[in-house]
Amino acid sequence: MPTEHPNVVLSRQHFDLMADQYDELFVTHMHAYDLTHEMVLTMLPFPRESALRVLELGTGTGNLTQKLLDRFPKSTLVGYDVSAEMLARARAKLARAGTRVQLHQGDISQIAFPGPFDAAISAIAVHHVPPPAKPILFHRLYAALRPGGVLILGDAFQPATPALGERYRQLTAEEFERQGIIETPAYAEYRSRNSQPSGGASTHLQKYLQWMQQAGFSNVDCVWKQFARAVVYGERPLEA
């Protein structure tokens, strides 16, 4: 059995610890959370009546999963997450979906995905993959897709410079203020007491695009970006 990378151990411990509060604290306080989900789903180039088979990386508590199942009512989904506690919340949330959803605990940098899939999706998860494993992951995702399948990833990316990152934080705070979103006491307490790193290691956006192209994806693009959040898209070409 492969030795777990320290980032993976940290991620699992972090999300196991915060699973009970994830939906309460982070859906509101994470910048562009719902908008990232919406852009991932909007870019799926399929009619809504399609019987899609979808792979999800980093299912978490099942929020993107539920939106996918609602938007594509004939779809099925296979999802993975490193945290057993997060998946327990997802299973409860998605109980009505029955056999349409299969959820598994595991390190997505090590799993052999049971393709073929029509689409692979993710939101705010792949940055937790250990840096050396990220390029390899894109090759494995390419192999898991059927010809004509699509990869759509929303994630947190590393700003080009520290100064730009600080500007992003300022603009996000201003946006929250305009929207009337205030830091709740529960979230302030979480931030003050949670000194354990989450295992995340964000990467420059251009690296994702480069790795996707190197893996064989075509029509690779950044289809949406707001500050340090972005959605990238690529297609596995139809074979002749």
Task: Set out the residue ranges of the language-model regions.
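Residues lining the SAM
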Residues: 122-127, 154
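C-terminal alpha-helical "lid/dimerization" subdomain adjacent to the S-adenosyl-L-methionine
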Residues: 154-213
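A short glycine-rich, Lys/Arg-flanked "PGG" loop and its adjoining helix->strand segment in the class I
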Residues: 135-147
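Core SAM-dependent methyltransferase catalytic element
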Residues: 215-240
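A short His-aromatic
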Residues: 71, 127-129
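Conserved class I S-adenosyl-L-methionine
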Residues: 2-48, 63, 67
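Class I SAM-dependent methyltransferase SAM/SAH-binding core
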Residues: 53-57, 61-110
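A short acidic, Gly/Pro-enriched loop at the edge of an enzyme's catalytic core
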Residues: 112-120
